[in-house]
Each structure stands twice: as C-alpha cells, then as structure tokens.
UniProtKB/Swiss-Prot annotation:
Family: Belongs to the MoaC family.
Gene: moaC
Reaction catalysis annotation: (8S)-3',8-cyclo-7,8-dihydroguanosine 5'-triphosphate = cyclic pyranopterin phosphate + diphosphate
Protein name: Cyclic pyranopterin monophosphate synthase
Active site: residue positions: D135
Its EC number(s): 4.6.1.17
InterPro entries reported in the protein's UniProt record: MoaC, MoaC_bact/euk, MoaC_sf, Mopterin_CF_biosynth-C_dom
Enzyme class: lyase
Amino acid sequence: MPANSRSARLTHLDDAGLPTMVDVSDKAVTARSATAESRVRFPAAVAAQLRANGLRSAKGGIVETAVIAGTMAVKRTHELIPFCHPLPIDACRFGIDWAGEQVLDIRCTVRCVHRTGVEMEALTGASVAALTIYDMCKALSHSMSIGPTKLVSKRGGKRDIGAAQ
C-alpha cells in the first residue's frame, strides 16, 4: 500500500461511511479550469466515409451537434452526478479533430470562478460529446468504440494536474 493512501480518504463519505456532499463553504473562491479528452474510434470504411462527407451524417453536422450536446452536459453535470456542486460555468470550449486515420479526438475545457473544481464537468462534456458522435454515426456501424476518456489537466485547486491548457 502506498504511504499516502493510508491518510487519503474518499471525500464523499462522512465519518460514519455514509455518502455526503463535500462542504466547500470554507474554500477560497479561485479561478478553476479543467480539460478532459475522449476518443471515438471508427472502422476504416466509416472513417473514410466521414472524411469524404466532411463529418456530416444523415442527421446533420456531427461536430456541431457533439459540441452542443457536450456543452449542455457540462451545464447539467450536477444533475447527473449526485455529489457535484452546481457551478456558474464561465466558459466551455471543445476541440474535435482527427487523431489518426480512424480516431476522432474530443477535448473539452471548462472554466469558472468558484470554490470547487470543474473536472467532472469537463469529463462529462467530453463523454457526452463522444456519445453524441456515436449516436450520429450508428446508422453507418455499431462497431465504433469510445475511450479512453480521461482528465488531461486541472488548475486552481489544492493541486494542479497536467500541462496548462
């Protein structure tokens, strides 16, 4: 067992082991940001078709729809994940582009000024954007895969993670 894991504890459990929302009322209000990434992998023929069609499907613009869905998800993260605080989101930006012949890379960066971070919002945005891309393309194939989805960076809390975005 790593030395630091003995003192670490799950923050969403109280002393009795019951689930609870973290009390952030004593935390300082600071600028917070987080970037998350997800990927959608397509079969070669589907990727070629999407490239030829400018990332449009019979349902419409794939990237545009994914950005809208991801943004909506960022703003509603607290409704989806029980112990997330509702946050005043100041910015939400997506980057969606090819990362190889068959993989679309989705990056979601979220910013706010508050007492708690926006990692879950960024992860939720990237995840829902990836799910939306799957939905937009499933008429072409169900052999797509999503992942990995991961936190790339976060700034403004107790500890920063990853490179500044």
